[in-house]
Amino acid sequence: MVMTDPIADMLTRIRNANMVRHEKLEIPASKLKREIAEILKREGFIRDVEFVEDSKQGIIRVFLKYGQNNERVITGLKRISKPGLRVYAKSNEVPRVLNGLGIAIISTSQGVLTDKEARAKQAGGEVLAYVW
């Protein structure tokens, strides 16, 4: 079966594993998913990420992060630009998520960036997801 939206699948897998407090999860790899996982790690939403090469496309292993008393670090993930309705933002219209408490993941001509990085580089692009 062909997957129509692999980014939504990745976010759903992370959301579901986070809800049941799994320590790690595995996601089929792609270049875009790797970049999104690296952003989540860099911004402190996940503990670690590793890339496992296999005979097919590879696997991204995501290690989820929890706070004291096993509370979730990721409270929400939302796919914004979908295959049926793409959402773009100009460089001066890059969205803020919860007044800066969350991040927007944006695919720009300069690579996949957070909303803060896109504002600093004055780059617009496709708004992939919100994470808070």
UniProtKB/Swiss-Prot annotation:
InterPro entries: Ribosomal_uS8 (IPR000630), Ribosomal_uS8_CS (IPR047863), Ribosomal_uS8_sf (IPR035987). GO terms for molecular function: rRNA binding; structural constituent of ribosome. Coiled coil: none annotated. Gene3D superfamilies: 3.30.1370.30, 3.30.1490.10. Keywords: Ribonucleoprotein, Ribosomal protein, RNA-binding, rRNA-binding. PROSITE patterns: RIBOSOMAL_S8. One of its GO terms (cellular component) is cytosolic small ribosomal subunit. It comes from the Bacteria. The keyword Ribosomal protein applies. One of its GO terms (biological process) is translation. Belongs to the universal ribosomal protein uS8 family. Part of the 30S ribosomal subunit. Contacts proteins S5 and S12. PANTHER family: 40S RIBOSOMAL PROTEIN S15A. One of the primary rRNA binding proteins, it binds directly to 16S rRNA central domain where it helps coordinate assembly of the platform of the 30S subunit. This is Small ribosomal subunit protein uS8.
